Regions:
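Regulatory modules associated with amino-acid/nitrogen control
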Residues: 1-97
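A short linear hydrophobic-aromatic micro-motif
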Residues: 45-47, 102-107
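Charge-rich, low-aromatic oligomerization/scaffolding segments with amphipathic character
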Residues: 50-53, 123-135
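Helix N-cap motif at beta-to-alpha junctions
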Residues: 62-65, 119-125
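Conserved short beta-strand edge segments in small beta-sheet-based binding/regulatory domains
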Residues: 75-82, 106-108, 134-135
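Generic non-transmembrane alpha-helical segments
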Residues: 94-97, 101-103, 129-133
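Structural preference for solvent-exposed beta-strand-turn elements
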Residues: 109-113, 122
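Phosphate/ribose-phosphate-bearing ligand recognition and processing surfaces
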Residues: 116
Length: 135
């Protein structure tokens, strides 16, 4: 696959909400923060990486060996609708639906899909909220 630079996908809010098609990743995730130098050693394992002035944030799978040691586990819900990076309003509608139920959400937009990170223990509530979201 070559490198693509234009933003493919849907931009119409009604079409986006009608086709969200959320999918739960069965593996818990964790957010890590490390110095830029230390983060380089974990990048191959990272689902997502973002550099900030203070260091690098990584989202990684939680290993079964250290599952019990986590303070906060996160579930990833992928919105399988192919949304454009230029789409307006979809994440606002999704965030509002989750906020109405008191579910924290950390969204990440990738090139083809959007991903929601919600507390692991609220993952089923989040899926239910998304299933009731209407255009």
């Amino acid at each position: 696959m070559g490198i693509a630079g234009s933003a493919p996908g849907l931009t119409d809010l009604r079409a986006l909400l009608a086709a969200l098609d959320p999918e739960l990743d069965p593996v818990p995730k964790r957010f890590l923060h490390a110095s830029h130098e230390k983060a380089r050693t974990r990048m191959a394992d990272a689902l997502m990486m973002f550099r900030e002035a203070e260091g690098t944030t990584l989202i990684v799978d939680v290993d079964e060996d250290n599952l019990g040691n986590e303070r906060m586990l996160w579930a990833r819900i992928t919105l399988r609708v192919q949304s454009s990076l230029t789409a307006v309003g979809m994440m606002a509608a999704v965030s509002a639906a989750l906020a109405k139920r008191g579910i924290p959400c950390n969204p990440v937009s990738a090139f083809l899909h959007d991903h929601l990170f919600v507390p692991w223990e609220r993952r089923d509530d989040a899926l239910d909220a998304l299933s009731h979201l209407t255009p």
